[in-house]
């Protein structure tokens, strides 16, 4: 018979392991960072609507582009009011997720907000416009916030979250969590070649362009990385495709050490892409709305990190 002190202590809003709670706090921190970035002076001008939002409209079907054009008009005509609202909402989401009694409320509210921003602010990440590229942030950073909100949802006391093979399976189950991982990383394989990065000079030009306006030390790193890609566009695209495919299926492998090795590879790959191709999300340029997909994909990898279980995984 177990002593009461040995049992997991139910927390407000669901049973949350220390690991799961830490991951929730990281997600909250990224939301807070987004709110702070939204308060940059340039965001309160028409440049935000014209330079950040407007380019995402091009190429989308009219059913997607028309509402985006309408939303763009509102942001263009009321830059201060709309941006203040955006910044405050994101700060509120971060604080709500970080404060344990309102964690569920914050996660729940972040899902529709993320979907709205993904549509009206990111043009669905370029998925329908032909501009989706996993190196530059496809399928859109903000949709990953919604995914993480679902995967990090506090498990109710009746759920067998203690038996989950990784934190992502604690609420929705292992089968659903693995399927989401597979779909996301498999899409990277498709978009790697659909984006045209395998064309001669495409990847080199893309990486080189990211150095514009960046601090000298970061521009040096990016330019040297661009030199390494010169003439190797197809080869690098093939390697990336193979790595993305391996990461996609790795969650189905029966060997824990092998799964962890693939997740480490995913973390390293995310870090390289975040620095070299995404330039830390452009946070040094004064108009970044988020740190891009690099940190979010890294957090996602940690959410899928294998843990010791007390029993069979929940399907």
Residue ranges: model-predicted function:
Residues 1-92, 99-315:
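Extended, low-polarity transmembrane helix blocks
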């Amino acid at each position: 018979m177990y002593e009461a002190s040995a049992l997991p202590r139910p927390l407000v809003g669901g049973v949350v392991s220390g690991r799961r709670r830490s991951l929730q706090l990281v997600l909250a921190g990224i939301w807070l960072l987004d709110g702070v970035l939204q308060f940059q002076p340039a965001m309160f001008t028409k440049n935000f609507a014209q330079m950040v939002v407007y380019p995402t409209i091009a190429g989308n079907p009219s059913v997607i582009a028309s509402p985006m054009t309408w939303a763009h008009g509102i942001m263009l005509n009321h830059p201060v009011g709309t941006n203040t609202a955006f910044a405050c909402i994101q700060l509120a989401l971060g604080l709500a997720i970080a404060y344990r009694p309102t964690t569920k409320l914050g996660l729940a509210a972040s899902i529709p907000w993320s979907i709205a921003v993904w549509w009206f602010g990111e043009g669905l990440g370029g998925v329908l416009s032909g501009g989706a590229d996993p190196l530059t942030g496809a399928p859109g950073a903000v949709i990953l916030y919604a995914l993480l909100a679902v995967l990090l949802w506090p498990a109710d006391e009746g759920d067998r979250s203690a038996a989950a093979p990784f934190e992502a399976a604690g609420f929705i189950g292992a089968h659903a969590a693995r399927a989401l991982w597979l779909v996301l990383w498999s899409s990277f394989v498709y978009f790697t070649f659909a984006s045209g990065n395998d064309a001669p000079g495409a990847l080199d030009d893309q990486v080189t362009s990211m150095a514009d306006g960046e601090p000298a030390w970061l521009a040096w790193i990016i330019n040297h990385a661009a030199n390494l890609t010169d003439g190797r566009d197809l080869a690098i695209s093939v390697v990336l495709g193979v790595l993305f495919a391996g990461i996609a299926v790795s969650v189905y492998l029966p060997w824990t050490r092998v799964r962890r090795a693939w997740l480490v590879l995913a973390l390293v790959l995310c870090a390289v892409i975040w620095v070299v191709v995404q330039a830390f999300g452009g946070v040094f340029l004064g108009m970044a709305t988020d740190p891009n997909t690099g940190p979010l994909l890294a957090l996602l990898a940690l959410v899928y990190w294998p843990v010791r279980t007390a029993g069979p995984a929940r399907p």
